[in-house]
Amino acid sequence: MKKKILFIDRDGTLVIEPPIDYQLDSLEKLEFYPRVFRNLGFIRSKLDFEFVMVTNQDGLGTSSFPEDTFWPAHNLMLKTLAGEGITFDDILIDRSFPEDNAPTRKPRTGMLTKYIDNPEYDLAESFVIGDRPTDVELAKNLGCRAIYLQEATDDLKEKGLEEVCALATTDWDQVAEFLFAGERKAEVRRTTKETDIYVSLNLDGNGGCDISTGLGFFDHMLEQIGKHSGMDLTIRVKGDLEVDEHHTIEDTAIALGECIYQALGSKRGIERYGYALPMDDCLCQVCLDFGGRPWLVWDAEFNREKIGEMPTEMFLHFFKSLSDAAKMNLNIKAEGQNEHHKIEGIFKALARALKMALKRDIYHFELPSSKGVL
C-alpha cells in the first residue's frame, strides 16, 4: 500500500507564531497551538500518515536569526510533542530569505523531491497543513490537498487556490475529525417535468450560502438553514413558477433532504438528536432525530395566505417532504403574532437543531443506537 503523508507547517500550525518579529528564537516565545497535542496525537496513533514537518525559517544561521537562538526552542518543541506520541518521519527546514527565490523555499518543492513521482507515496491522498496561502500553494505544487488553518478562504480565491483547500478551520478538533471520519459533502440533482434542482452541501462548512429558487422569501428561509447550522449550502432551482409555487418548494425540500441524508453517511459518532427554542416575539421549537424513521409533527398556524411570494400552506408541505427525504423525525411547534418572524424562527430553530444533531465525536465514534442500525 502506498504511503500517505501529512506535510505539516511549524509556526502558526504546531506553535503560535510570535506576532512581533515572527521568529521563535527563545523559550519564552514557545506557545503551542490550542488542542494540537490531543488531536495530532490521535491522528498519529489512529491513522497511517507519515508526518513530515516543512518550515521556512527566514535567514536561519545569519546574524538576523542565529542558530543558537533557534535550536533550544525548536528542540524543546520536538521533545514536548514526542512526549505526547507525536514524532516526525522527516523535518525539512529552509533557511533562505523570501527575496532569494530559493527552489527549496515553500511553496516551491525543492526540499520535497524525494516524495514527488515516487511510487512509494500517494500524494493525491496526502495533505499539507498550514496557516498561510503558501502552504495551500505547496499542496497544489505537490498534487495533494490542503488543510488551511484559517477561517476564511477569500485570499485563496484571489490566488485561484480554493479548489486545493479541502478544509479551512482554526480548530485542530475539526482537522482530526476531517482526517479520521472523512468529508460530509453531497450533491443531488433532481429533474422532473416541473423542476430542475441542484443542491450541494458540506455539513462541516462555515455557513456559506448560494441560493436561488426564484422565490425571494423562500431563498431567505433556506439561507437561515445554512447560516445557523454552519453547513455550506448551494441550491439552484428552475421551477414552473408560471404555473404555481408548489413544485418548486416541494422538490427543493426533497432534494435538500436527500442531500443531507447522503452527506450523513454511516452516522457514526453523530449526536443524532437536536432541539432549539429561539425567542423573538415568537416561541419556536424544533426537535429532530436522525433515527431513520421519518415523521412530522406540526403545530403551527398561519393566518396570512402568503409571506412574500411563498404560500403559507406550503410550509407544512416543505417540512414533511424534507423529513421524508432526510429520513428524520421532526417535531415543530410555533407560537406568536408576527407571521414572518414565526416561520423565520422555525427555519432558524431547524438550523440550530441540525447543528446540534450533526455534531460528530471521533473519540466516541459509535452508532448512536442500541439497535446497531439507523
From Swiss-Prot:
Cofactor note: Binds 2 Mg(2+) ions.
InterPro entries: HAD-like_sf (IPR036412), HAD-SF_hydro_IIIA (IPR006549), HAD_sf (IPR023214), His_synth_bifunc_HisB (IPR020566), HisB_N (IPR005954), Histidinol-phos (IPR006543), IGPD_sf (IPR038494), ImidazoleglycerolP_deHydtase (IPR000807)
Highest taxon above the source species: Bacteria
Gene Ontology cellular component list: cytoplasm
Pathway: Amino-acid biosynthesis; L-histidine biosynthesis; L-histidine from 5-phospho-alpha-D-ribose 1-diphosphate: step 6/9; Amino-acid biosynthesis; L-histidine biosynthesis; L-histidine from 5-phospho-alpha-D-ribose 1-diphosphate: step 8/9
Location of this chain's protein in the cell: Cytoplasm
Main location: cytoplasm
Cross-referenced PANTHER family: IMIDAZOLEGLYCEROL-PHOSPHATE DEHYDRATASE (PTHR23133:SF2), IMIDAZOLEGLYCEROL-PHOSPHATE DEHYDRATASE HIS7 (PTHR23133)
Protein name as it appears in the record: Histidine biosynthesis bifunctional protein HisB
Species: Bacteroides thetaiotaomicron (strain ATCC 29148 / DSM 2079 / JCM 5827 / CCUG 10774 / NCTC 10582 / VPI-5482 / E50)
Gene responsible for this protein: hisB
